[in-house]
Structure formats: C-alpha cells, structure tokens
Design a protein with these regions (language model features):
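Residue(s) in the substrate-gating loop at a strand-loop-helix junction
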Residues: 110
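Active-site loop immediately N-terminal to the catalytic Tyr-X3-Lys motif
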Residues: 68, 115-121, 143-144, 185, ...
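Active-site helix of classical SDR
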Residues: 90, 126, 134
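C-terminal substrate-recognition "lid" of short-chain dehydrogenase/reductases
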Residues: 87, 186-215, 220
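Short, small/polar-rich loop/turn modules that mediate ligand/substrate recognition or access, typified
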Residues: 56, 142, 147, 208-210
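Alpha-helical segment proximal to the catalytic Tyr-Lys
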Residues: 95, 139-143, 206
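Substrate-binding pocket helix/loop in short-chain dehydrogenase/reductase
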Residues: 66-67, 74-76, 178
Length: 222
C-alpha cells in the first residue's frame, strides 16, 4: 500500500500503523492537485512497489457559504482539490495499471452529487464532476481491464464531516442529530466507507464498473 498525501506526519503514521499490523506500506509526499508533485510521487511508488493495480482517489475538502458570497478563487481551489486531483492521480497511475493487465479505481464522490444542500453549490458541483469522471473512465477503459467506480458517503463522523455539520448549522441548515437520524438512521463511521471501498477494489467486485455505491444508510433512497 502506498499513501500519497501532503500531510507527511499523518501519512507516515498511517503507513507505520499498516506495517505494525503486518502489511507493507510506504508514504510518498505530494500535493495531489499539482501535476509535477503527483508525477514524482507516483514514480517513487512504482519504483518501490511495482505497478499500481488499485487506486483510491480520496482527496477532498469543502466550501460552505451562500453562493453569492463565494469567490472565483474558492471555486478554483475546490475544483483543484476535489476534481483535478482525481484527474492527475488517475492519469499518472493508468500507464502502469494498463501495463500490469488492468486494475481498479475508486473515486470518493458524495450524496452531494445527487442531493443538493443549501450553501454547498461549489462542493455539490465538484462531487457531480467526480461522479461522471468515474463513469467516463469506466467506459473508456473497460475493455482494457480497468474498473472505475465512485463511492458516495452520507454524513460521516470524520473531521471533514464534522466541519460540514458545523458550517451548515452556522447558516441555519438543520443537520442536528435528530434530523440526521431521520435522514440516514445515524451518523456514519469511517469503517462504513472503508468497507465499501475495499469491496469495490477487490475481485469480489470484478463485474462492477461505472457505478456509484451510496454508503448513506438510505439517505438517497427516501
């Protein structure tokens, strides 16, 4: 396993935890929204571990504010973090994946790709792009042995999820515990999403590509 992130401290800790559990893991520092940085990191990973056969595009952030208060700079920044990162990482990894005979890619989208939320126009737009990026890659590379799917979490108890709840509450959007319980039963946990990602990357999902797996306990089914 290779972890590619700009947060070296947390990345190294995660790699160390994987190794402590008996796995083989390395960390490669990179800003995944920067082409040169991504190229260098992927070359390092391939040099140390060989061809990449599984890729999880998970970098993401959020902007929460009324649309008319958002700026072009915020739009471009969020597009870079949430969408350009997937483009760059996938483009850098695909050559070695194709050389290895195929592989699997999972992109983190969100319920926000299909369920709009007030004050999240920028975020919702990026997640809609993630949705279609995964589908388009799946269609183009199916015959070459590469699968690509999107995983779409609901509200998850992570630093990102907690920031979203705080930000929406600030603007009067009801994301209280009772409301979230009504929408999706409970707050999701990181393991709920991790299990779905591992499944989509595994051979158990060998006939699944170009789809979106909603990990939201029924949020989008209502």
């Amino acid at each position: 396993v290779a972890i590619v992130d700009r947060n070296a401290e947390d990345g190294e800790k995660t790699a160390a935890a994987i190794r402590a559990g008996g796995g083989n893991a390395i960390f490669a520092a990179a800003d995944v929204s920067d082409e040169a940085s991504v190229g260098k990191a992927v070359a390092e990973v391939v040099g140390k571990l060989g061809p990449v056969t599984a890729l999880f595009n998970h970098a993401g952030s959020i902007v929460i504010k009324p649309f008319l208060e958002t700026t072009l700079q915020e739009w471009e920044w969020l597009m870079a973090v949430n969408v350009r990162s997937m483009f760059l990482m996938t483009k850098a990894v695909l050559p070695s994946m194709l050389k290895a005979g195929g592989g699997a890619i999972v992109c983190t989208s969100s319920i926000s790709a299909v369920a709009a939320t007030p004050n999240e126009v920028l975020y919702d737009t990026t997640k809609g792009a993630c949705h279609m990026f995964a589908r388009a890659i799946a269609v183009e590379y199916r015959e070459r042995g590469v699968r690509c799917n999107a995983v779409c979490p609901g509200f998850i108890a992570t630093p990102h999820g907690n920031r979203e709840v705080e930000g929406l509450t600030k603007y009067g959007v009801d994301v209280s515990d009772p409301t979230i319980a009504m929408q999706q039963g409970r707050m999701g946990q990181p393991d709920d999403v991790a299990g779905a990602v591992v499944f989509l990357l595994s051979d158990e999902a060998k006939f699944i590509t170009g789809t979106q797996l909603f990990v939201d306990n029924g949020f989008t089914a209502v």
